Regions:
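Extracellular distal adhesion/interaction modules in secreted or cell-surface proteins
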Residues: 23-152, 161
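Short beta-strand-plus-loop segments that form exposed binding edges in beta-rich domains
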Residues: 158-164
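Extracellular carbohydrate recognition
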Residues: 165-173
Length: 208
């Protein structure tokens, strides 16, 4: 019984560690299919990402929380990088590397709801691209586009303009994962019900 109670309590702690139903909000943008000359097309398609947009007007989150960045792949002749002064990130990658999951963590930081981001792809010999610029693509769940991503993870691709603006955006692939600081109401309710159940079993055991 003690083991059962301990296991149940541990499960409730894990449930409580979940996050609210919050995520990234993408404003505007027309999505296009990821082209075949993107070296990571099949890898992105396997993640149900088959579109990308470069003409969006804003990207933000709808709740306070933490954003964690991971780098996943690079196909480019230039030394390219990703930076954010707010997150304290300034990473440079001189060599190509294949697509990797879960990827390598390159930094994280706390954000407020509706905060503006200072994320930027950089290139030693190409053209830098900040959020909202042509070289900075956001991969989408479908090629039809959406005004609200509604997801906790955003996948971003860079086109350094090294071979001209080919818009394949595989010169560096980075993801940003958002975790809300506020537990969702359903999780709080589950915790309450679970604790009540633990109390019931504990009382019943004492009575036996």
């Amino acid at each position: 019984m003690k083991r059962l109670l301990a296991t149940t309590a541990f499960g409730l702690v894990l449930a409580m560690s979940g996050t609210a139903d919050a995520g990234f909000i993408l404003s505007g943008g027309t999505s296009n299919s990821i082209p075949g000359n993107n070296d990571f097309q099949s890898d992105l398609n396997a993640l149900a990402l088959d579109g990308f947009t470069i003409d969006y007007t804003d990207l933000t989150v709808d709740a306070p929380g933490t954003i964690t960045f991971r780098v996943h792949g690079k196909e480019a002749g230039f030394t390219n990088g990703f930076e954010s002064s707010d997150a304290g990130i300034d990473e440079q990658y001189p060599s190509d590397f294949g697509f990797d999951l879960p990827g390598t963590v390159i930094g994280s930081y706390s954000v407020a709801d509706m905060e503006d981001f200072d994320w930027m792809f950089t290139s030693a010999a190409g053209v830098d691209a900040a959020l909202g610029e042509q070289g900075f693509a956001i991969f989408t769940l479908n090629a039809n586009g959406s005004s609200n991503i509604g997801t906790s993870v955003v996948w971003m691709g860079f086109d350094d303009d090294g071979a001209g603006p080919d818009d394949n955006h595989d010169d560096l692939i980075v993801s940003a994962r958002f975790a809300s600081a506020v537990p969702e109401p359903a999780t709080i309710g589950l915790l309450g019900a679970g604790l009540a159940g633990l109390g019931f079993f504990a009382r019943r055991r004492r009575m036996c």
